[in-house]
Structures are given as C-alpha cells and as structure tokens.
C-alpha cells in the first residue's frame, strides 16, 4: 500500500494505521462530487454522509484503510443523492451502526420515505441547539435554523465537532441563505478544520464564513468533471485570505486531516488499487428486469464486493461471494422479474427505469466500472 502525505504542520511521528492517542482524524473520501466524511478519535468513529451509490467501492476501501468495521453514528446532512446514495451499501454490507441522525428539514419526500427509513433504520431528528455526545467529544447542531421549501441544500445539518484536540465545522451543502442565517445567529464558528459547503461552489462560503471560521485547514470534496467550476476560484481565494490552507479531494483517494492539541495537518490519501481479474460483460433485459453477468474469459472470477448500480433510480445491489466460472453466467433478477428466471434476487421492484434513459453498471470492489449496459 502506498500513501502519500504532504503535511503542513508537523506534530511528530504519526502512525499511518490506527488512531494515535490524543488526536482526531478526518478523512474526506474521494467519492467525486459528493460527501463521505469519516471522523475518528478515542471517543468515536462516525460517518458524515455516504456519497453517491456508485461510489460505494471508494467508501468501502477508505473504511478498510482506516480499519473501520463499525460506526458509532451516521449523520446524514440532507437527502440529496450525492450525500445519501451510499446508505444502501452500508445496509447491504451489514456494517454495524449504533445510531442514525438526520436533519428534520426536507421537502422532497414525506418522512416515511426518508433515505434512512428506506434502508429499514429509524433516524433521530436533530434540531438546532441539540448536542450528540460521545465521551469528551460533542457534535453540536448549529443549523438548519429554519426549513427551506425551495432548496434542499439549505436544509443541511451543520455540525461543530468539539473534542479535546480542537474543533471541526461540518457544513453539508449549506448555500448562501442558510450560511447567512448561521452567521446572523451569532454561533461561534471558529475552528481548526472546515469542511467547505457545497463542494466549493460559488453559491456558498462568503468572506463572512471564511473569516468567522478562520480554519487552519479547509477541505473541499468535489470532482470538476462532475461539477464544472468547482472549486470556485473565488471561494478558494476567500479561504486563503482568511488564512486557511485549501485541500481538494479530486484526483485522490481522499484528504486526511489530523488534529492534535489545536494544530491541524493535512495530506492526500492515495493507495495502490487492487486489480480486478477477469473479463465480465453485463447485459440487461429491461422488460423482465434481468441482468446477466457473463464471464467471457478463461479463468474463474470472484464477484465478492462487486455491485450493480442503476443510474436513473439510484439503486444499488451488492453482490455476495459468488464466483463466476470461466464461460459461465449469473443472472440477477428483481421482484419485477418472472419467478424462476434468475439465480440471485435483487430484492427491489422497478429497479430499471422505464420513464427515462437508464444505465446499469457493474462496479468492482474499488468502485471502478467494469461493464455497463
């Protein structure tokens, strides 16, 4: 495994695995234009948002690199797919989660259709002023202060993590209106680490926020190929003028920040990707909702931790420990497929959209597309 770290502030020799005593770590996983933020210290290991469904392999790998096998909590800042899409992966992979937290403000669906409830879990709704505690670590809920009926981004949970080593401000996709309300509230936004709102887009992170935070490290999670113009040059300039070093996940496995006794240091996370051995082709029969995986090579292929993803419906199916023999096929059906016509059941209906163009992709365990149809 290769990891590259370019630390800004040295605080001694740091172990590259595990969590050293007396520090907090933040990993902004490189999930494209989305958020999946792992935070770990002696008190807890939590996940803030889950990225898009198709990036599940990238989240899986980051959790493995961090040694995370269970989560004390998942905080879902808001319901947009680039933050909530990976919930299905967490559920299907069987990763233990002690508690689920969410913003009570959203308008896209009724509460019974909230993404956390869609995976069979019950969220605890966090109002501004609430605090979630793990030992000496607190997650203070600063926003939303009111419900937006026009922009889900402005319904984002905004959290301040406060621990013995310092403060991290976690802002979801907060845009200008929520940002202004937060500034007007008089909340103390000073922090060592800022997770920059809304992927560094130009609709957030004004000078007021940059100066109020005055963070040592500002982290932007985005991919300009998915969201051109991010990070916005003006956003980066305002952060730098406020004294922040800006780190962007694009092109890397992620960004790691370590916080120790008020000093923050950042570096890029990069690791050698495992090879996917085999030549697997995907074919889809949309009418019967059957997806056929065919091994066209001359060696058996393991499908462990591979997954299928339907783009239009944002649906994900994690394959099991199936081995696909050379020249063999595996047929995946859904609850809409005729009984007895498939080998493995994707336990959902209407996975493939018949209302708009859909693409189903087979992804390998690292989150790389293998075959699409």
Where are these regions (language model features)?
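Non-globular, low-confidence helical/coil segments that flank catalytic cores
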Residues: 2-3, 7, 16-277
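Repetitive helical segments and hydrophobic/amphipathic motifs
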Residues: 11-12
């Amino acid at each position: 495994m290769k990891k590259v770290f370019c630390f800004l502030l040295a605080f001694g020799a740091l172990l590259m695995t595990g969590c050293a005593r007396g520090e907090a770590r933040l990993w902004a996983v490189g999930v494209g234009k989305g958020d999946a933020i792992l935070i770990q210290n002696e008190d807890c290991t939590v996940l803030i948002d889950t990225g898009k469904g198709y990036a599940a392999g990238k989240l899986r790998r980051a959790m493995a690199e961090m040694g995370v096998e269970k989560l004390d909590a998942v905080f879902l800042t808001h319901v947009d797919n680039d933050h909530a899409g990976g919930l299905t992966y967490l559920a299907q992979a069987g990763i233990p989660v002690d508690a689920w937290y969410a913003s009570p403000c959203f308008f896209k669906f009724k509460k019974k259709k909230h993404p956390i409830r869609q995976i069979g879990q019950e969220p605890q709704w966090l109002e501004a002023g609430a605090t979630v505690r793990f030992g000496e670590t607190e997650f203070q809920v600063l926003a939303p202060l009111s419900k937006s009926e026009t922009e889900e981004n402005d319904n984002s949970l905004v959290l301040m993590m406060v621990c013995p080593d310092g403060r991290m401000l976690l802002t979801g996709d907060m845009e200008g209106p929520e940002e202004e309300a937060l500034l007007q509230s008089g909340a103390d936004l000073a922090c060592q680490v800022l997770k920059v709102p809304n992927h560094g887009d130009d609709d957030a992170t004004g000078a007021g926020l940059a100066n109020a935070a005055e963070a040592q490290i500002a982290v932007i999670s985005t991919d300009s190929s998915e969201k051109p113009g991010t990070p916005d040059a003006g956003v980066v300039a305002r952060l730098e003028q406020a004294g922040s070093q800006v780190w962007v996940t694009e092109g890397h496995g992620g960004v790691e920040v370590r916080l120790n006794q008020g000093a923050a240091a950042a570096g890029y996370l990069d690791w050698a990707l495992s090879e996917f051995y085999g030549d697997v082709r995907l074919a889809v029969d949309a009418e019967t909702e059957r997806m056929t995986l065919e091994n066209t090579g001359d060696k058996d292929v393991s499908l462990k931790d591979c997954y299928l993803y339907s783009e239009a419906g944002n649906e994900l199916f994690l394959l099991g420990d199936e081995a696909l023999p050379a020249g063999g096929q595996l047929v995946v059906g859904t609850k809409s497929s005729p009984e007895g016509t498939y080998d493995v059941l994707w336990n959902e209906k209407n996975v493939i959209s018949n209302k708009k163009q859909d693409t189903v992709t087979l992804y390998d365990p690292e989150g790389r597309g293998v075959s699409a149809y």
